[in-house]
Amino acid sequence: MDIKLINIGFGNIVSGNRVISIVSPESAPIKRIISEARDRAQLIDATYGRRTRAVIVTDSGHVVLSAIQPETVAHRFMSNKDTKDSDK
């Protein structure tokens, strides 16, 4: 099993193998997920004080906040996956 690392901005990296979803923080259910993760001490704020633009949910229940667009994170995720596939 290869480890996929995804850059989520400002030098922060998450394991692509653990990502369940990448979503926008605008909706009430996502805001509730963020609040619950904060209460459980499973929220990772990687925005460096900037506006949250993407919320990354992992299989361990951690929630990661990123200051880059969800589409950008998804593109990096897919391009990293394509690079790994072409190496085989």
Swiss-Prot record:
Superkingdom of origin organism: Bacteria
Lineage: Bacteria, Bacillati, Cyanobacteriota, Cyanophyceae, Acaryochloridales
Family: Belongs to the RemA family.
Designated name of the protein: Putative regulatory protein AM1_5498
Pfam family, one: RemA-like
